[in-house]
């Protein structure tokens, strides 16, 4: 699942994606990947996301919700280090500072490479089984239909196996 904290559509799907990920069939999982394009804001956002993922993965969903709130509702920017320190505090993430320093450039580059590999050109985008890329644009922004499409694509892949 490719997302950007600067994307209002991603913010609107935040809780939906979190709930949906818990309903996936056995053997399936949702991987959230920040859009790690080489600009300062996205670079910092991706680094913060990976730091939380490493430091305190059980707090990742809370961190994402806090980041969306700060950026989408409170007008903070992805370039501002204060955005991430506040999101970490709001989500009660432990071990963030050490993890921040351990996020490598290679990890950010791998996330960017995946973005290019799958041809992701909009957020949010779901890549299903490495074969299908779907966005809310595919269903004219209908969130219920988008989630049904995602479930249908997973069923299709399961039948093909």
Predicted segments with their positions:
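Short pre-active-site segment immediately N-terminal to redox-active cysteine/selenocysteine motifs
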Residues: 3-6, 122
């Amino acid at each position: 699942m490719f997302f950007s904290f600067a994307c209002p559509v991603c913010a609107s799907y935040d809780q939906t994606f979190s709930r949906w990920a818990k309903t996936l069939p056995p053997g399936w999982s949702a991987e959230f990947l920040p859009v790690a394009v080489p600009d300062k804001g996205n670079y910092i956002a991706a680094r913060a996301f990976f730091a939380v993922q490493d430091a305190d993965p059980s707090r990742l969903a809370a961190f994402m919700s806090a980041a969306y709130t700060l950026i989408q509702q409170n007008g903070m920017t992805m370039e501002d280090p204060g955005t991430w320190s506040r999101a970490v505090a709001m989500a009660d993430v432990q071990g963030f500072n050490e993890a921040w320093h351990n996020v490598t450039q290679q990890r950010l580059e791998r996330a960017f490479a995946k973005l290019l590999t799958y041809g992701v050109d909009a957020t949010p985008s779901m890549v299903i089984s490495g074969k299908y890329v779907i966005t809310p644009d595919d269903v004219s922004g209908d969130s219920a239909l988008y989630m049904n499409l995602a479930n249908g694509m997973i069923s299709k892949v399961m039948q093909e196996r």
